[in-house]
Design a protein with these regions (language model features):
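FIC/Doc superfamily catalytic core
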Residues: 1-241
Length: 241
């Protein structure tokens, strides 16, 4: 992905490259989007599917079904004439509901997927909007997008949607998403702790070297520090023993 964004030549289908660029653009503009605006939802779809589908940024006008990799129809989306009103109702519910945002965002994700408002790109928009809702509640989620959370759990993700569809309610999907979010948060915390430990280890090592130097010297100057710690860093003033 980095190579694509840096303009380097990448051996990949043009569609894949376009998806990466489109995704980067919309996630860069995440804080500009109103999570309860129909217009912003359509704008997001327009950006994410630009150059990839015939009609971007508009609700579908034909019946659509959700199919699996083998072409089996999993469920049919809402009849197109009802899509705009249902999407507006769902956005209003997300704005006014008193359910905790962690659960509310999961319900929104599932219900928008069920409505299936677009001819293509529904999953990407659902996951983006899930991220947007969470990031409005806690900005940390802007750095932990739902798209990344489910990246390695896609089979479980689609299975949870299918089971919930069969059951006629979203409990299984909500439980899966909350579990995936928790796991990703724990991984992020673990990585942060590891980086902090590594940084602390380097700082401790520098001070140990300085302490050893001061055992045989009365003081240490900035120039001496650079030579002692061996990494080009120095203190702003002399350190005396």
């Amino acid at each position: 992905m980095t190579a694509v964004l840096n303009g380097k030549q990448v051996l990949a289908p043009p569609k894949d490259i376009a998806e990466v660029k489109n995704a980067f653009e919309i996630y860069e503009r995440l804080d500009e989007l109103d999570p309860y605006s129909v217009d912003d939802l359509l704008t997001a779809h327009d950006i994410m599917t630009r150059g990839l589908v015939e009609k971007s940024g508009v609700f579908r006008s034909r019946p659509e079904g959700v199919v699996d990799n083998e072409g089996n129809v999993l469920h049919f989306g809402t009849p197109p004439q009802y899509v705009p009103d249902l999407v507006m109702e769902l956005l209003d519910w997300a704005k006014t509901s008193e359910i905790h945002m962690l659960i509310r965002s999961c319900v929104f994700h599932y219900e928008l997927e069920l409505i299936h408002p677009f001819a293509d790109g529904n999953g990407r928009v659902c996951r983006l909007w899930h991220t947007l809702l969470l990031s409005q509640w806690n900005p940390a989620f802007a750095w932990l997008p739902v798209e990344s959370i489910i990246h390695d759990r896609q089979q479980e993700y689609y299975a949870a949607i299918n089971v919930s569809n069969d059951a006629g309610e979203s409990t299984v999907f909500i439980e899966f998403m909350l579990s995936a979010i928790k796991a990703s948060l724990m991984d992020a915390i673990s990585m942060s702790d590891k980086m902090s430990d590594e940084k602390m280890d380097k700082a401790t090592l520098r001070w140990k070297k300085i302490e050893e130097y001061l055992k045989t010297h009365d003081y240490i100057m900035n120039a001496d520090v650079r030579g002692v710690v061996g990494n080009g860093e120095s203190n702003s003033c002399p350190i005396s023993n």
